[in-house]
Amino acid sequence: MEAARPAGTFVVVGGGIAGVTCAEQLAINFPAEDILLVTASPVIKAVTNFKQVSKVLEEFDVEEQPSTMLENRFPNIKVIESGVKQLKSDKHCIFTEDGREYVYKKLCLCAGAKPKLICEGNPYVLGIRDTDSAQEFQKQLTKARRIMIVGNGGIALELAYEVEVCEVIWAIKDKAIGNTFFDAGAAEFLTSRLLSEKSEAKLAHKRTIYTVEEAKKETSTKSKADYVGSALGPDWHGGLALKGTEEFSHSIHIETKCEVKKIYLQEEFKIMKKKSLAFPKDHHKSVTVDKEMWPVYVELTNGSIYGCDFLVSATGVTPNVQPFLHGNDFDLGEDGGLRVDEQMRTSLPDIYAAGDICTACWPPSPVWQQMRLWTQARQMGCYAAKCMAAATMGHPIDMDFSFELFAHVTKFFNYKVVLLGKYNAQGLGVDHELMLRCTRGQEYIKVVMHNGRMMGAVLIGETDLEETFENLILNQMDLSSYGEDLLNPDIDIEDYFD
């Protein structure tokens, strides 16, 4: 083991959006200090083309780059390409997988999260979390005639829409798609797009750019079986050709209110003498037995069994805390993340955390909630760096304004989607009202009202209402007198509140 190095004041663990943003902000604050960024991957996630759309809403590209590009931009950032083997918080040092020891004065853990796999060690079950796993999925898909997607989050939603020339069985535990993001009305609006023929003229993807081939050590990622990649950014599928082998274009069947009960390999399935279902054609309810043989069979809790070439597990993530727990008495949140206070501090001195690995445990704004999304990873990483800087210099710091209002802009099924505040009436109980406006195939607008005040909104399509609604939620103005006119398409609501 090498002798401990005087490794500088700041060490950041994790090459995802939170870690890289944190390191960049520290490098700006302390240009004379070496900032160490420890990451198991040869590529890092960089935020580019950042645009502050409104007070809280932001848009940016996520670009995968070789770590050398980060070092070129910030000469005082030193990237250590190795996983963390152990953290000794009492000694203020970390040990990396390559046998080195690094001492820190302040440490920020941004190691992200790992996918919850339905079944560990099954070659026919793929989890999609990072670019490596997304590319493995693309490779498998080129040989596939039918796949099953299990899960109802953002990645599952995108896969269901983007996968072409292949039958897709989509199993969700909820009544409707996209339960994390949408109510039944928005789900119905999107489902009609999903089940209709897709337009050939798809809008150009504009956010994620993959430059994995530029990384000189790309192959080295394959040897690190335990490496947990950072989350995929927005439009992660933009550079991937998600096509299977069948002739037809887009064929999908949704199984609702069910989960995976058991997975059988082909030989096991033959011995069991069970019957699997054929792919339901034209959305008819008639059930026929599948005569084809498949490499893997999936039995659902509703009794249905389908054969497929492989199964995609997209059932969410768990914070990647395991490498840091041994010998360290961290307080953990209910979801398993490292608890952090309003200055992103964990329960251990001089250790901060940001992004998917942490659980926000400060009293939140009434219209903010933590969700493990790339926007919050960027905000938390940036704010954690500012908190570390303030503590180092002995300055007070106010909570960042981005935590005043939950705001997220993304794209689902080629629609622009904006989520604001308590967009699904989270935590409001029954004492709230919903206002809706929907033009099929064009836009879906939902506003959540509580005691005459706007608490949240879902905007699907090009509505141009996000800035106005953001202001109304932040201002908490009494809107009772406006009634239904808030969503009247014949009234320019922006003129009311300029």
Curated annotation (Swiss-Prot):
Chief location of this protein within or outside the cell: nucleus
A single BP term in Gene Ontology: cellular response to oxidative stress
One GO location term (cellular component): cytoplasm
SUPFAM superfamilies in alphabetical order: FAD/NAD(P)-binding domain
Cell location: Nucleus; Cytoplasm; Cytoplasm, Myofibril, Sarcomere
Domain of life according to the entry: Eukaryota
Pfam families attached to this UniProt entry: Pyr_redox_2 (PF07992), Rubredoxin_C (PF18267)
InterPro entries hit by this protein: FAD-bd_OxRdtase, FAD/NAD-bd_sf, FAD/NAD-binding_dom, FAD/NAD-linked_Rdtase_dimer_sf, Rubredoxin_C
Keyword Transit peptide on entry: no
Descriptive protein name: Pyridine nucleotide-disulfide oxidoreductase domain-containing protein 1
EC number in record: 1.8.1.-
Family per similarity comment: Belongs to the class-I pyridine nucleotide-disulfide oxidoreductase family. PYROXD1 subfamily.
Cofactor note: Binds 1 FAD per subunit.
Cofactor: FAD
Known function: Probable FAD-dependent oxidoreductase; involved in the cellular oxidative stress response. Required for normal sarcomere structure and muscle fiber integrity.
Region forming the signal peptide: none
Keyword terms: Acetylation, Cytoplasm, FAD, Flavoprotein, NADP, Nucleus, Oxidoreductase
Modified residues (N-acetylmethionine): M1
Molecular function (Gene Ontology), one example: oxidoreductase activity
